[in-house]
A protein has these predicted regions:
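Glycine/aspartate-rich loop-and-adjacent alpha/beta segment that forms the canonical ThDP
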Residues: 29, 176-197
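Cofactor-binding active-site loop characterized by glycine-rich and histidine/acidic residues
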Residues: 1-116, 134-140, 145-152
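Structured core elements
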Residues: 10, 121-123, 157, 185-187
């Protein structure tokens, strides 16, 4: 991937492929992921850089993930607001899990995005378990994409194991946003084989 020049993404800690899609190198992604010397992430022990599973690459628009997952939605909504206010042609992507979609921060972010028509998509990855809570005990909605209805913007569900669906969905969301359509939510149905981390 060459990514999209100027666009910004906020991945979750396991979203290594998103950095590659935006144009980061395999070496940089692995150095950051493993906390090795040469990482483009600051910190670590003895300037080793990075932290396990926390990758980011500012030079290609990939923000470092945050451990509290809902924060990405707020950060990216703020950056989308700045882009909208400055009339920049820039698209923002905030990745969160289904558990994070029950947080107040996420709802506040979506409310602002919907009210202002901000150029952002929220990728809600439903891996069937938030820390240790099953989806049926987290929310009253049966289809997680329905959460966007309350904020007045479109959403759809894709199969998380289908790379073509990922590409087509994010490309559609980007085109929609940059043509003035506003925010979207992409609900990704996937499965994690075990509990947290």
């Amino acid at each position: 991937g060459k990514g999209y020049d100027g666009d910004l993404v906020a991945p979750m800690i396991r979203d290594i492929g998103l950095g590659l899609a935006m144009g980061d190198t395999s070496l940089d992604v692995m150095a950051a992921n493993l906390g090795k010397v040469g990482s483009n992430q600051n910190g670590g022990w003895d300037d080793a850089g990075g932290r396990d599973l926390h990758v980011g690459a500012w030079h290609v628009g990939v923000l470092p993930p945050t451990a509290p997952l809902p924060i990405a939605s707020v950060t990216m909504t703020g950056l989308a607001f700045a882009a909208w206010h400055q009339k920049l042609e820039r698209f923002q992507v905030a990745c969160i899990g289904e558990g994070a979609s029950s947080s107040g921060e996420f709802w506040e972010a979506m409310n602002l995005a919907g009210a202002r028509g901000l150029p952002i998509t929220y990728i809600l990855q439903n891996n069937q378990i938030a820390l240790d809570t099953s989806p049926i005990k987290q929310s009253g909605v049966e289809v997680w994409a329905d959460k966007a209805d309350a904020m007045g913007f479109p959403a759809w569900t894709i199969d998380g194991s289908d790379p073509a669906a990922w590409y087509a969905s994010t490309a559609s969301a980007r085109e929609f946003a940059l043509n003035g359509g506003g925010p979207t939510l992409i609900h990704v149905e996937t499965m994690r084989g075990c509990g947290h981390a």
